[in-house]
């Protein structure tokens, strides 16, 4: 009898759901939307999921690439950021459309249309991508805590585990609270870099010219490598899974054509607006790198280098001050914290969607966090908290994102182009072929970037 009770408790803690379970069940359809309201009131109701998705496009993993791009080639790579952002808008709109029309997220759809063995394989690949994303966020947060409070890196890494408790509290308060907290953190990042760029006084005409693509991006090997880094970091695999799930947090009747159509319209507007904000932040990072570090011998390849440079008048000139350095660290912490919230949600979506593993929220999020914290902690202990060595881990973590990209993009384009799945909401011909072209280019660029990172291509 006692053994049966123990078995029952284990099954309650960890069990496998049937395939019909909803994505992020605790918040699915939890946000009411008006039915006969005007444009702005309706948009306000749908605004929120886009900001959670946009966070992935300005996480700590993107910072170094953008700033280094500006420091090395001034404003020339702004065009790459623009093109990358437009690609992200298209793919994220497709992810949201998939979730709204089918009521299934990308992980669930992929699992539904593959064998059990293939589903398990895809889960492992995607889980590694989540870990890679989380590693960048943990490292960014831990370094920010050290810069702000002189906290040992190992202690900072352990403290980031507490994000799980914050997320649990926010989930109890409602999904809109999560959206509000993340939006506040993103606003902090935007304001900090806008302020620092204004102080840096960039050359505006030259800056605007940087948004026009030019041949040097392809012909110059160093410029091409940094461009690949920017593009490779733009489309984050976990964001496609996340977007397809949280688009379902708005309560609609999928049997009513007009409600589905309206949900797609306003979710796409929300996504594009928030990704525009991410585009602005990434532009500001590159502009800051160009205005302050172009033509100097200063290294800006690491967070600590950037922090120190902002208070060094020999590098950044008269605007140098400890305040600029502190603001940079605050923005880094805000970026890390906002990204960990969305990364943990994506981890839950992927685990439940691919292998139908259902766990209590605290166990699910603790497991997701520990899977990412553990390798960083081991690395930090092994290298005695050396920042340079730990930031190298951040660089290599991006390789996993590149490996996982095809396993997210290809199914997304397949499912959203299939009329049997999407009905009349399937991709139009020009959207489908544009998406396939973009997917092919992204995959080739990422494979090339992997080969360069691992030293197979010089």
From Swiss-Prot:
Keywords in alphabetical order? Cell membrane, Ion transport, Membrane, Symport, Transmembrane, Transmembrane helix, Transport
Q: Which GO terms describe its cellular component?
A: plasma membrane
Q: Which organism is it from?
A: Lacticaseibacillus paracasei (strain ATCC 334 / BCRC 17002 / CCUG 31169 / CIP 107868 / KCTC 3260 / NRRL B-441) (Lactobacillus paracasei)
Q: Which Pfam families match?
A: Nramp
Main localization (coarse): membrane
What name is this protein filed under? Divalent metal cation transporter MntH
**Keyword Ion transport carried by entry:** yes
Q: Name one GO biological process term.
A: iron ion transmembrane transport
Q: Could you name the domain of life of the organism this protein comes from?
A: Bacteria
Q: Where are the transmembrane segments?
A: 38-58, 76-96, 119-139, 151-171, 180-200, 223-243, 275-295, 315-335, 370-390, 393-413, 437-457
Any idea what job this protein has? H(+)-stimulated, divalent metal cation uptake system.
- Localization annotation: Cell membrane
Question: How does the entry describe its membrane topology?
Answer: Multi-pass membrane protein
Q: Which family does it belong to?
A: Belongs to the NRAMP family.
